[in-house]
UniProtKB/Swiss-Prot annotation:
In-chain residues carrying the UniProt-annotated modification Phosphothreonine: T110
Modified residues (Phosphoserine): S121, S122, S162
Annotated protein name in UniProt: Hepatoma-derived growth factor-related protein 3
Domain PWWP: 11-68
An annotated GO cellular component: extracellular region
Gene Ontology MF annotations: growth factor activity; microtubule binding; tubulin binding
One matching Pfam family: PWWP
Biased composition, class Acidic residues, residue ranges: 121-130
Main location class: nucleus
Length: 203
């Protein structure tokens, strides 16, 4: 199907916006707040439903929502996409500040959990990184995963190191005991066998 001719959009228009690497996403043409940086020529400020992210896109990457709802409005497994479809239908006036309020609430919850032990808090911190990473774009998510694995490995190494040293000493001592006992046990077996032979020869 041929692309539609680029057209003029105004603030508040509902569209599907296409960015490289992402499906056609439910979005809204935003108005520029006073004092904001002006977008490049022929670019519109876009607010993406579901993720509440913003970008500047040209008219060739924008598709009117009503005309393309049947084509692009199918549910998708990408995080935030289905929420975006719901928002564009039920709450098209949602503002970016709503997302910031959610972030502030989650950061205050994080501060309130400071009384946990070191191991428990590091595990929970790793979970938080993963949850936060799901809402981010693909390249940012990879960085979060690295952080998570790095912190969890670091904490597990520290927790293994102190008890592990004692365990290693205990294991070595037990090995020495068992090897010396094993030698005696082997001698005992030989003695027992020779004793049996002597006994059988004597009878």
């Amino acid at each position: 199907m041929a692309r539609p001719r680029p057209r003029e959009y105004k603030a508040g228009d509902l569209v599907f916006a296409k960015m490289k690497g992402y499906p056609h996403w439910p979005a809204r043409i935003d108005e520029l707040p006073e004092g904001a940086v002006k977008p490049p020529a022929n670019k519109y400020p876009i607010f993406f439903f579901g993720t509440h992210e913003t970008a500047f896109l040209g008219p060739k990457d924008l598709f009117p929502y009503k005309e393309y709802k049947d084509k692009f409005g199918k549910s998708n497994k990408r995080k935030g996409f289905n929420e975006g479809l719901w928002e564009i239908e039920n709450n098209p006036g949602v503002k970016f500040t709503g997302y910031q309020a959610i972030q502030q609430q989650s950061s205050s919850e994080t501060e309130g959990e400071g009384g946990n032990t070191a191991d428990a808090s590091s595990e929970e911190e790793g979970d938080r990184v993963e949850e936060d990473g799901k809402g981010k774009r693909k390249n940012e998510k990879a960085g979060s995963k690295r952080k998570k694995s790095y912190t969890s490995k670091k904490s597990s190494k520290q927790s293994r190191k102190s008890p592990g040293d004692e365990d290693d000493k205990d294991c070595k001592e037990e090995e020495n005991k068992s090897s010396s006992e094993g030698g005696d046990a082997g001698n005992d077996t030989r003695n027992t066998t020779s004793d049996l032979q002597k006994t059988s020869e004597g009878t």
